[in-house]
């Protein structure tokens, strides 16, 4: 169970990712190699696993999103 502090941190993370999706991502066009996109993955990971594990999973995912990695489906792991 998430504590109030963890819930607040998760809200900040999700808000930052949502800001990126709405205001920054449209400037560059679609570039993610995966389904779901890295930003959608980040929101789902934080909502499903909390801010710390979800944040870690998101960082791992972002590190794989480059031209030398095969593209495809990479869902958020279950708990």
UniProtKB/Swiss-Prot annotation:
Compartment(s) where it occurs, according to its Swiss-Prot or TrEMBL record: Cell inner membrane
InterPro entries xrefs: Membr_insert_effic_factor_YidD
Keywords annotated in UniProt: Cell inner membrane, Cell membrane, Membrane
Alphabetical list of Pfam families matching this protein: YidD (PF01809)
Main location: membrane
GO CC annotation terms, alphabetical: plasma membrane
Membrane topology label: Peripheral membrane protein
Superkingdom of the organism of origin: Bacteria
HAMAP family given in the database record: UPF0161_YidD
Summary of the function given for this chain in its UniProt record: Could be involved in insertion of integral membrane proteins into the membrane.
NCBIfam families: membrane protein insertion efficiency factor YidD
Family (UniProt): Belongs to the UPF0161 family.
Protein name: Putative membrane protein insertion efficiency factor
Provenance organism: Prochlorococcus marinus (strain NATL1A)
């Amino acid at each position: 169970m998430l504590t109030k502090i963890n819930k607040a941190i998760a809200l900040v993370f999700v808000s930052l990712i949502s800001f990126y999706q709405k205001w920054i991502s449209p400037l560059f066009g679609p570039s993610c190699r995966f389904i779901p996109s890295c930003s959608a993955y980040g929101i789902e990971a934080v909502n499903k696993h909390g801010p710390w594990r979800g944040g870690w999973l998101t960082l791992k995912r972002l590190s794989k999103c480059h031209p030398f990695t095969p593209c495809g489906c990479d869902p958020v792991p279950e708990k």
